[in-house]
UniProtKB/Swiss-Prot annotation:
Pfam families: dsrm, Ribonucleas_3_3. Residues 154-224 form the DRBM domain. The active site is at residues 44, 116. HAMAP family: RNase_III (MF_00104). It catalyses: Endonucleolytic cleavage to 5'-phosphomonoester. Keywords: Cytoplasm, Endonuclease, Hydrolase, Magnesium, Metal-binding, mRNA processing, Nuclease, RNA-binding, rRNA processing, rRNA-binding, tRNA processing. This is Ribonuclease 3. PANTHER family: RIBONUCLEASE 3, RIBONUCLEASE III. Residues 5-127 form the RNase III domain. It comes from Vibrio campbellii (strain ATCC BAA-1116).
Length: 225
């Protein structure tokens, strides 16, 4: 057998005993009334625990604040979406017609949610130690590279400090669009920044996430010329 799911399982480093779990983890709410949001809820908590536990033992002298910032960096939607792209998850997602048409298989929030759902599915298919090993294998290079300190500050904080250090005005964030139902919204934010010609656009499942995405893009533009 060499089905598409077999190929994905090889990328994930885990073979499911219950194929229904991986299929459910890949099913977006737009595609079916049985979808991956409950698995996502479970996977989110498991991921947070596994990463927190690793950081606690990896950095025995680091304070709670730095560990929280490192964990936030590792479990944020952007990082999860990167993992999703490394697994080519977009090729396997089950989306409704509207999401397919709008390119949902490329959207950070959908990829990130699917990664969390897969973590939940692996846990239900095995146990906490098995899922811990899988998650740590996915995160190995990121855990080796991460260090406590300034780099773990969120993008809005880093952008503010960057501008303050150059005596420039603080950025102005404006919500320009909100679409979707209350439980599944996408926010679009414009960020006006001194030194950047056009407003920078950020999108996210909340206003805060959209502002953070815009701030991160603005920082990249300012620091890369």
């Amino acid at each position: 057998m060499n089905s598409p799911i077999d190929k994905l399982e090889r990328k994930l480093g885990y073979q499911f005993k219950d194929a229904g779990l991986i299929n459910l983890a890949l099913t977006h709410r737009s595609a079916n009334s049985k979808h991956n949001e409950r698995l996502e809820f479970l996977g989110d908590s498991i991921l947070s625990f596994v990463i927190a536990d690793d950081l606690y033992h990896r950095f025995p002298k680091v304070n709670e604040g730095d560990m929280s910032r490192m964990r936030a960096t590792l479990v944020r939607g952007h990082t999860l979406a990167e993992l999703g792209r490394e697994f080519d998850l977009g090729d396997y997602l089950k989306l409704g017609p509207g999401e397919l048409k709008s390119g949902g298989f490329r959207r950070d929030s959908i990829l990130a949610d699917a990664v969390e759902a897969i973590i939940g599915a692996i846990y239900l298919d095995s146990d906490i130690e098995a899922v811990r090993g899988i998650v740590l294998s996915w995160y190995n290079s990121r855990l080796e590279a991460i260090k406590p300190g300034v780099s773990q500050k969120d993008p809005k904080t880093r952008l503010q400090e960057f501008l303050q250090g150059r005596r420039k005005p603080l950025p102005v964030y404006t919500v320009t669009n909100i679409k979707g139902e209350a439980h599944n919204q996408e926010f679009t934010v414009e960020c006006d920044v001194a030194g950047v010609d056009k407003p920078v656009i950020g999108k996210g499942t909340s206003r805060r996430k959209a502002e953070q995405a815009a701030a991160e893009t603005a920082l990249e533009q300012l620091t890369n010329g």
